[in-house]
């Protein structure tokens, strides 16, 4: 049980370093860009699937 407590303490410290270090803001910007890229790819794949017709 102590091992789990130490493991979660280390994970929390690493998350705090990322959160308070300014990396979170940069990651949020990158995540927004990736979100729109994958939405566009999803829309393109839907259109391509619709244009190809029914498959047998």
UniProtKB/Swiss-Prot annotation:
Keyword Transmembrane helix: yes
Keywords: Cell membrane, Membrane, Transmembrane, Transmembrane helix
Compartments where located: Cell membrane
Signal sequence segment: none
Bilayer-crossing regions: 4-24, 29-48
Main location: membrane
A GO CC term attached to the entry: plasma membrane
Membrane topology recorded in Swiss-Prot or TrEMBL: Multi-pass membrane protein
Annotated NCBIfam families: PRK13682.1-1 (NF010226), PRK13682.1-3 (NF010228), PRK13682.1-4 (NF010229)
Protein family according to the UniProt entry: Belongs to the UPF0391 family.
Stated name of the protein: UPF0391 membrane protein Jann_3570
Organism: Jannaschia sp. (strain CCS1)
């Amino acid at each position: 049980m102590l091992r789990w407590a130490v493991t979660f303490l280390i994970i929390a410290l690493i998350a705090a370093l990322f959160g308070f270090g300014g990396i979170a803001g940069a990651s949020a910007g990158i995540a927004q860009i990736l979100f729109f890229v994958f939405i566009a790819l999803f829309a393109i794949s839907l259109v391509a699937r619709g244009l190809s017709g029914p498959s047998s």
